[in-house]
Amino acid sequence: DATAHQIGWKSLACGLSDIASMGGVAKYAVISLGLPRRLSVEFVAELYRGIKALARKFDVEIVGGDTNSSKALVMDVAVLGFVEPEKLKLRSGAKPGDIICITGSLGGSYKSKRHLTFTPRLKEARCLVNNFRINSMIDISDGLSTDLNHIARDSDVGACIYEELIPVSKDAKGINAA
């Protein structure tokens, strides 16, 4: 089970990752909540603390939103930012011969609960677009094979990956051994 802080953190982290995947800089967020009446004030305060903690880390300003009553917890997070036209990276930009790179180890997020507190790769993405000729990027939150397929399809290219070169998290090792 996720804590309120983790839920808040992850809700903003997903939007920040989308900005990072295009080479952008996140600036603002709008947070809208549908809150069941059964939730405590403490839960909601901790939810906002999770959002604010990540917003502070990346200098993102919460500029608005809405709060309503609902039967279930509903969160809608919109992140706004900017990217210089020459640094904009789309999933449709891959070219034959491009090298496929990732910025961290894969797998094990469920076991380690890392998926609840991951840090968006905004700094890494900006470093890449500022220092290298990058043709395409994507947030691989849906998994390497699924998201690599999105790039290949949208760019009309193929892809070849070498399993032995994929960095696998220690938390993922042995999961499928059973």
Label the predicted regions.
Residues 11, 113, 174-175:
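Stable alpha-helical structural segments in soluble proteins, enriched in small hydrophobic residues
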Residues 2-7, 114-118, 135-136:
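Short pre-catalytic strand/loop immediately N-terminal to key active-site residues, enriched for Gly-Thr
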Residues 23, 139:
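Conserved G/P- and acidic residue-centered "switch" motifs that form tight phosphate/ATP-binding loops
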Residues 1-22:
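Active-site cofactor/substrate anionic-group-binding motifs, chiefly glycine-
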Residues 108-125, 129:
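Short, compositionally biased
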Residues 8, 12, 44, 93, ...:
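Short, conserved glycine- and acidic-residue-centered signature motifs
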Residues 25-110:
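Glycine-rich anion-binding loops of enzyme active sites
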Residues 2-3, 36-63, 71-73, 130, ...:
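Glycine-/charge-enriched secondary-structure boundary and capping motifs
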